Regions:
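Bacterial N-terminal signal peptides that target proteins for export
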Residues: 1-9
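Phosphate-group recognition and catalysis centered on beta-loop-alpha active-site segments
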Residues: 22-403
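Bacterial N-terminal signal peptides
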Residues: 10-19
Length: 403
């Protein structure tokens, strides 16, 4: 049994052990009220659960069905990645290249559209959303890109527009009686700008039409690039989040930054020596956080900036199962000190994605990050994130009663 779960079970047992005493009913009622107040203070700030591409661990990503399932499983927000079609519509796809997430490669009528394109400095072959009208996109069907995940829903669901995602979320908000929001990402803004299909104005127009173009709307806008967030900060009061990537983790736990994924692509094309000298890692320094705080509400770092991993000589199994956890960094505390929230990505259930310390149980990973003070998590498995949050609430309630 892992340490976080052992601790929770011990605290749970303690909660139900009646302590002896001779207090009056009034005293007991007062103490009970005080405990309740403390518990409420402890539980009032809980991390957001963001359905990463919807419930993408179970259904083909970025479909209305995946978003709806994430909401049913308890997501506070769902995340549509946005790319543009040839005729300027915003659709939910993880990349402009749709070869891996749709059935386009099996459609003979579109065979001539296959080509090589350069996206953020990397050449890739496939089919690109900007070569298709929305009407053509609507004839395609989504598929699950990861082979270890359920494949039986391939070919069943269409590709939604941003407006359709917003309509779904608004309907679910009414059905569930709780606030549900969207967390759109502007994918490859520099790439889309070069195509004459800029994303920012189209996104803000859709939010305005939905009544969501304001600070208190249930919306976060995220991007890996910096200049488009700065531009957005001058056009909208919607909360903005600076994503922070890295390419890999080295054996010693340090993060690897390999071109062209070593920095925001708008830095790469800027030609500015001071930006070309930086990597994404700069954004996690005190100076970088101070800079981000000038235009953004928060940061969205890869979780390895918060808890990295190192090679485990005794580790076995695939992927990260062969690695163990490094000591947590102080990024969350420093970001909070700079006035920024922290929403980390991506949390997944598969064994190959869990370092050995978690003993094969993804709940343990969530609990660690929750206990470190994370403000939100992007999860492929919303239900697991929500269960872990319930355990966090229990832990806080027990701790408050023990005060």
């Amino acid at each position: 049994m892992s340490q976080p779960l052992r601790k929770l079970l011990a605290l749970s047992a303690a909660l139900f052990i009646a302590a002896p005493g001779h207090a009056s009913d009034t005293d007991r009622n007062t103490e009970r009220a005080e405990r309740t107040e403390r518990a409420e203070r402890h539980t009032q700030r809980l991390p957001l659960v963001i359905g990463h591409r919807g419930a993408s661990g179970y259904l083909p990503e970025h479909t209305l069905e995946a978003y709806a399932l994430a909401i049913e499983l308890g997501a506070d927000y769902v995340e549509p990645d946005l790319v543009a079609t040839k005729d300027g519509h915003l659709i939910a796809r993880h990349e402009p290249n749709i070869v891996g997430t749709t059935d386009v490669a099996s459609r003979p009528e579109f065979a001539s559209r296959r080509r090589v394109a350069v996206v953020d400095g990397a050449a890739e072959e496939g089919f690109f959303a900007s070569d298709f009208t929305l009407a053509e996109i609507k004839t395609l069907r989504a598929k699950q890109p990861l082979g270890e995940r359920p494949q039986q829903f391939n070919g069943q669901f269409t590709i939604p527009t941003l407006q359709e995602v917003i309509a779904l979320v608004k309907r679910k908000t009414l059905e569930k009686g709780r606030v549900i929001g969207i967390y759109p990402e502007t994918k490859h803004p520099t790439y889309h700008q070069a195509l004459g299909l800029p994303l920012e104005g189209r996104l803000l127009k859709a939010l305005t039409q939905a009544g969501w173009n304001h600070r208190h709307a249930p919306v976060f806008i995220q991007s890996f690039e910096q200049s488009n967030l700065i531009a957005l900060s001058k056009l909208t009061s919607v909360r903005l989040v600076q994503l922070i990537d890295a390419d890999d983790v080295n054996a010693d736990g340090s993060l690897a930054f390999n071109a062209p994924y070593d920095r925001p692509y708008d830095w790469t094309v800027s030609g500015k020596p001071e930006l070309l000298a930086r990597t994404f890692g700069y954004l996690t320094t005190d100076a970088g956080l101070k800079e981000v705080a000038q235009y953004a509400y928060g940061i969205g770092p890869w979780k390895r900036y918060i808890v990295s991993t190192v090679a485990d000589p005794e580790g076995s199994g695939p992927g990260e199962a062969k690695r163990k956890l490094a000591e947590p960094t102080d990024l969350i505390d420093r970001a909070h000190a700079a006035g920024l929230k922290v929403h980390a990505y991506t949390f997944r259930n598969e064994q190959r994605r869990l370092p050995s310390d978690y003993a094969g149980n993804p709940i343990n990973e969530y609990l660690q990050f929750y206990q470190l003070g994370i403000d939100g998590v992007f999860s492929d498995f919303t239900d697991t994130a929500v269960v872990a949050r319930e355990l966090l609430k229990l832990e806080r309630r027990i701790a408050a009663q023990a005060d």
